Swiss-Prot record:
Residues the record lists as Phosphotyrosine modifications: Y246
Alphabetical list of InterPro entries matching this protein: ESRP, Nucleotide-bd_a/b_plait_sf, RBD_domain_sf, RRM_dom, Znf_CHHC
Phosphoserine: residues bearing it: S23, S54, S63, S90, S310
Signal sequence bounds: none
Protein localization: Nucleus, Nucleoplasm
Region annotation (2 X 16 AA Gly-rich approximate repeats) ranges: 234-433
UniProt repeat feature Sequence, residue ranges: 234-249, 354-372, 374-392, 418-433
RRM domain segment(s): 11-90, 111-188, 289-364
Organism: Rattus norvegicus (Rat)
Protein name: Heterogeneous nuclear ribonucleoprotein H2
Keyword check for Ribonucleoprotein: yes
Phylogenetic classification of the source organism: Eukaryota, Metazoa, Chordata, Craniata, Vertebrata
Amino acid sequence: MMLSTEGREGFVVKVRGLPWSCSAEEVMRFFSDCKIQNGTSGVRFIYTREGRPSGEAFVELESEDEVKLALKKDRETMGHRYVEVFKSNSVEMDWVLKHTGPNSPDTANDGFVRLRGLPFGCSKEEIVQFFSGLEIVPNGMTLPVDFQGRSTGEAFVQFASQEIAEKALKKHKERIGHRYIEIFKSSRAEVRTHYDPPRKLMTMQRPGPYDRPGAGRGYNSIGRGAGFERMRRGAYGGGYGGYDDYGGYNDGYGFGSDRFGRDLNYCFSGMSDHRYGDGGSSFQSTTGHCVHMRGLPYRATENDIYNFFSPLNPMRVHIEIGPDGRVTGEADVEFATHEDAVAAMAKDKANMQHRYVELFLNSTAGTSGGAYDHSYVELFLNSTAGASGGAYGSQMMGGMGLSNQSSYGGPASQQLSAGYGGGYGGQSSMSGYDQVLQENSSDYQSNLA
């Protein structure tokens, strides 16, 4: 007897938005009204090519009726996060699980290792000498640089075979000069995540204590400088400068990638999970009323952020994860209304543990982004004056409305980089934008004086 279409394709749902630390038992509790096939074995988590959780999973159920029950859980919450549930099938599940994760065909046995702790100015010749006797493929070395063109102290090396790469791993903790070198198994996919720098970092850098506005990197400019140009050309010390050969693709199941082969669904999920990549946060708001946080303690949890905004009640918290799997110190917080997001800005420059936290508003009144009630805004500013370290200043002007510039000079580049400097007024007025730039510049000059 032939199986029905449902029988051949199985009874599967796909879950998105899971907490990073979520376990199979927690997924089973979330679907407690549904019969999951084979218990915890029926929960199939999706991992990135670096082996980190993607926040997604497939769940195998026992019948079509169980699938219908599971779909009713769409947009319900797990902890403080709402979870999306989609109908899927066994074909999609098998394909995705095969082509993702650290053991996928795209990452296994490609002979890559990653070095960390290289001396400043370490050359390719020194690395070749370090691996003397182990064959490195032609043009098989990549030396990443940061967004200012400086060496990161890391390198990626591709050997002629996986067996040679295993031998290279045995040199872990040996020295180059006075520095001991850490060596880790890597993959072509990891090289790609380092190949093109995060756009958010290229367009906005928090000034250092000795920085001065100048050519290519002023506080109020978006100058790109030599570091940007080196990275734009793929100048990672040579190496894999021709990654256009690995053109972007979309597999039809939502696992798209850019032209460097980086996953667009993860990200730094994070990173974009960059961020945590992705040319900025991968956070997608459902209400359009968000506050971006910067300067969080690296051990801050979602609960810490909920408590930080108490008595306000955020709908969702998304802590950014960088491409190295570490938190970036930034997060996006979603509120139900524009008024709640505005009220949350009263916490700008407040401390969380030992660090003060900067807040950037990303919300407009109404769906059309029309002008907000200025009497309310002025009342809010007056009620919070002095408490926020002067982060707002007197910037209700021109077509920009209110722009939340930060207190260290108000870099206007934030308004271009990640969209966190949005105002309440219509932002199509370039004259208003220019006026904000001019005021920021004059404010900064007066601060220097």
